[in-house]
Amino acid sequence: MSLLRRWFDPIRSSWFYQKPVRQEVLPTDQGLTIYLRLDDVYSYLAAQQLPQLEEILTDEMKPLKVVISNQTASPPNEMSALEWQQYCLNDAKILSKQHRFSFHETPEQPNAEALQQAETILRHTPLRGQDFLYLMEDVFHMLWQKQYGKLRTLHAMASRHHQVQNFPERVFNQTPVLSAYFEFADRKYQAVDDLLRLARRLEQQKLLTDNPIFLINHIEWREHLISDAEELNEIQALDPELDLYIALEDPISWLLLAYIKEELADYYNIQLNIYPLSYHGRDQFDWSLATRLSKRSEVKFTPFCRPTAAASLAMAELFYSVPAEQQLEAMYEILRQVWTKGKDPSFKTHFDQLRRDLNIEQLTEQDISLRLQQNDMYCEMKSQPSLPVLELRIAEQSYVFNSLYRVWMIESIFSNVLEELYKSENESENEQRKT
């Protein structure tokens, strides 16, 4: 590891974390823009929030600018187009259930003819502002709820009675859009996952006229969905298991592992299994994002020393040198030393200190690189677009999700499992009464 990184990372990271937060006032001259694709399921979910957002924007932020692209971008994490499409449909279904979006029980990608008809309707309509957003929401409903008859009727009317319109706040182009996102002052916000963060930013700058109410069932950090003792016992008795596939050089791995271990594992009796991955180059991360997540999740962070490939390998060697039943505590301690004490496991002095702290007398003789490659392979089989990857097993069901944006799913799944359990018990009781 670079001596500069070992010396200066802990100093810089501590300063960055502790410096007074002066909320930068972002320029508003470009307004607020949302980028959509008619064949993007996240755009469909976002479209259901836009009329409300437009309604509470201040006059200087109106109108909300809409860019509709017909060009997708390459799927993340080397996923195939089909894998990405299926992932998005499944994920959107989960989001729609959690936040009560309108969504079809068996969603399908709209066909090319329907997409062309939808674009024609939106190009031809003379409606503007909130009226246009309501129309666009209706058009998205027709596309994604398989209401093709309604779409054809509206298309015929639009083609017959209106010409193509040209409004500055409505743009049709080929900007590559992977999934819907907002743009404000050259900053991007994912249209669903970052909507609350965007709303907080707009509220801080007094760019909203009313309190934003989006994603009504959002689960905050350190907030538990289940607090009733009887319900809690039900979940604990099901012995849930959670596999975590983590890149050791990624601070999000530490923040999520620490949060889950400290806040959820004992509370819900979750057995945690850790699968470290080979170096993915995630030490070049967004310091602001990691700092913000640390403060919101109340997980200690900094001073840190960003691990290199060699440091990640050394961390994995320590992890696999302790007995299996001690590996969770070992990984927690290794990551804690790196991300809150500024230790560099590729530096022999720090490595030896970690080894003593973990009571490791003999280092493993396993081929660590090979072991990490095996974990990589298992992780890739989960077909997830980002890290960390999580797999939760409970009540003979398995649920796979990923990243800091989906940690709330752990508690949401538990709540749904309880709901199904009680529903099944009630049905059984009703059947017994009949007999």
Regions found by a protein language model. Name each.
Residues 81-84, 88, 160, 249, ...:
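Residue-level preference for long, well-ordered alpha-helices that form the structural scaffold
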Residues 35-40, 245-250:
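Aromatic-flanked redox-active Cys/Sec active sites in thiol-based oxidoreductases
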Residues 1-25:
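Alpha-helical membrane-targeting segments
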Residues 38, 42-142, 254-341, 421-422, ...:
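Structural alpha/beta surface segment adjacent to cysteine/selenocysteine redox centers
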Residues 22, 26-30, 68, 72, ...:
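Alpha-helical context
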